[in-house]
Amino acid sequence: RRRGVEMLFHPGTHDCVAYDMAWGGAEHPDIPVYLGANTGHGKRGHPRLERGQSNKSAFLLTHFFPEEISGRLLVPPKVEHALVDDAIEVIVEFPDGYEPEGGSIWWMFDRAPDGSPQYLSEPIPDDNFAEMHYDDRRGVWCAEIELDANAEQIDFFSIYLSRVKHNGRGYETYLS
């Protein structure tokens, strides 16, 4: 970043070449990432996966032709969670000026360790999906996930939509 380099990391949640997402997110939280649910080399993706995303095109157009772009790419948000009775509330806040148009969340209980065969092969269940909602009072995006009483851990990630335009053509972009 000191050299003016822009980055967008675009792995899948089940990709054999990007199995260390949790480590990467913890060590480099300022790098924008898009995680397609259940995607990776040879993976079909989750039934609720975003179709028609144009992240790479939007990223390149924004980088090389910034004066010709309307709209802006999102930056990584601040993510927090809190236990609420038998659920976990996920709270996501974007910096001022970065307003997503919508969001969704996926989760898995007791996912296998990073890089293990099970980590890469066991998909996020089809039903483990919800739309995020915007809380006007708090100025944050929220979702509540009912916890599995038998689970020891939960992995969740959320995705947010923004659009940019170049020469009248719209590009849907997503950020996790």
Role assignments for model-derived ranges:
Residues 1-30, 34, 43:
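The feature captures the conserved acid-bearing segment of alpha/beta-hydrolase catalytic domains
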Residues 7-18, 88-93, 101, 144:
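Alpha/beta-hydrolase
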Residues 11-13, 37-39, 92-94, 107-109, ...:
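Active-site proximal loops enriched in glycine and acidic residues that flank catalytic Cys/His/Asp
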Residues 20-22, 45-49, 169:
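Short conserved micro-motifs at the rims of enzyme active sites and ligand-binding pockets
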Residues 39-53:
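Catalytic histidine-centered segment of alpha/beta-hydrolase-like enzymes
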Residues 59-107, 128, 135-137:
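Surface beta-strand/loop "capping" patches
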Residues 95-176:
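C-terminal beta-sandwich/jelly-roll accessory domains of carbohydrate-active enzymes
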